Amino acid sequence: MPNRSIENLFSGLTVPISAVAEIRRTLAAAESFDDAVELFSFQEFLQNEFPELESIGAALVEKLETGKRFVLLKDLPFADFELPVCKFLVLALATCWGRPRPTYEFSNRLVWEVKPVKDLPPGYVPTVTEHAQDVEPHTDSSFKQHPERYVALFAVRPARSGGLSTIVDGRTILEQIASLGEEASHSALLSSGLFPFRRPTAFTRTRREDQPDWIEAPVVSSLPLVRYRYDVIERGFQCLPDIDTHERRQALKVFRDALTRAPREVVRLAAGDLLLTNNHEILHGRTAFDDGNRLLLRVRMDVDRGLI
């Protein structure tokens, strides 16, 4: 492997004309993007068009597990193509370091468009990927029994201003809590107690506010190390008022205060940039923005590398 950083190895990546042609043929033969994905042989595609990516992908996984727990890849050429082709290329790349998983259990959608959604039904509460407000650092898929280990965010159209990615290492949050000693007497509940995580309405089967779905899980465990999303827990307490106790509220406050104090990195994604995170150990968020055209693509991946 050349003597340069893993991130920079992707900066010279080119997309062969033959690769784009194959993707377009597959899309034309399918009724939908998701159906096209099911028809496509990603393994053969990568071996033929991007044979160098397998070894680079393995090196990236090692960095996610032993380094800073996130990697920023710059200037990928995927955003130069029409959106369906761009989504295909991002998905193909994602298979190099994990197994892409559906956005929710009863769907085959592997690529989620992160963009402000207009004309929402009355009373519908948008999830964080559907609005433009500030988003506190959180765990992706916190409301799933088994959150995916890796999350990739690819910038197709970044916001003109705002919309910056914020990253906090979960290990530093736990170190801060441990340093408090008796001042954080309720913090043991973060690992020994169960907290309610309500599934966002966008990811429920009925997509109705009056038919909620939730799980109960600890905030701190061995796998994932941290599971946290404040708005999801808050709405979970509304579903399970019997466990909305003073002790749980105090434990949650200890965690949230430590999150506020913890160092955070701020990343500005330009068009073509991809942020890859270890979702079990870091929290990621976003600053507010006012550009309705902002578009990111998200792919969640399990730890086992493989193809769809």
Region spans (language model):
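Active-site environment of non-heme Fe oxygenases that use a 2-His-1-carboxylate facial triad
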Residues: 1-53, 58-59, 65-71, 79-80, ...
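Short glycine-centered, acidic/aromatic-flanked micro-motifs in structured strand/loop junctions
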Residues: 75
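Non-catalytic, well-ordered alpha-helical scaffold segments
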Residues: 87, 91, 147-150
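A short alpha->loop->secondary-structure connector
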Residues: 90-100
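Short secondary-structure capping/junction motifs at helix and strand boundaries
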Residues: 98-109
